[in-house]
Regions:
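Conserved phosphate/oxyanion-binding catalytic-loop motifs
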Residues: 9
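Cyclophilin-like peptidyl-prolyl cis-trans isomerases
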Residues: 2-4, 13, 20-198
Length: 198
């Protein structure tokens, strides 16, 4: 083997090795510390890679620190990640493409109790930073077809510890708050930090 070929092969191996280390782990975990307690979510990067990458970008930038759970509906879900403690909407990156078709084809997570999904508007490709955690099985939110209500919501993670904290949050009395007429916790639930732990 010539010196040139050896050097080329070594460079290729180093490049591939560096690329492997830069990839997101198959199941990264994020720890949330809130005013109601701590919980950890495990993300499904294998079935919803773009959604997970987007979410981790917000985690790593510190976006979620200082945001609140602004929408809490017992027997449905708790939603946060978009508003600060004064109910001012935080700026976000461009929205991401809905990944429901791909996630479903890969046997991805469904909207069952304890799963994490991206919130969005009526536009299926409008998810950015806001997320919700299902507090019951909400199969009607699952992706069915790429049209109308069939788009559903992409579940991309699940709570692996601290479900008692989620259950505590879901039982918080709600009412009006900021620009919202209903469903706002009357005792504010603040996200103090969100950090990648695995």
């Amino acid at each position: 083997m010539t010196t040139f070929t050896r050097r080329g092969l070594m460079a290729l191996l180093l490049t591939l090795s560096a690329g492997l280390h830069a990839q997101t782990p198959a199941n990264p975990q994020v720890k949330f510390v809130t005013s109601a307690g701590e919980f950890v979510v495990e993300l499904a990067a294998d079935t919803a890679p773009n959604t997970v990458e987007n979410f981790l970008g917000y985690v790593k930038s510190g976006h979620y620190t200082g945001t609140v759970f602004h929408r809490v509906i017992n027997n449905f879900m708790i939603q946060g990640g978009g508003y600060d403690a004064k109910y001012q909407e935080k700026s976000t990156k461009a929205p991401i493409k809905h990944e429901g078709v791909e996630a479903k084809a890969k046997g991805g997570l469904r909207n069952t109790m304890g799963t994490l999904a991206m919130a969005r508007t009526n536009n299926p490709h409008s998810a950015s930073a806001q997320f919700f955690i299902n507090v019951k099985d909400n199969d009607f939110l699952d992706h069915q077809a790429p049209s109308g209500q069939g788009w559903g919501y992409v579940a991309f993670g699940k709570v692996v510890s601290g479900m008692d904290v989620i259950n505590k949050i879901k039982q918080t009395p709600t009412g009006p708050g900021g620009p919202f007429p209903t469903d706002v916790p009357q005792t504010q639930v603040l996200i103090q930090s969100a950090t990648l732990v695995k």
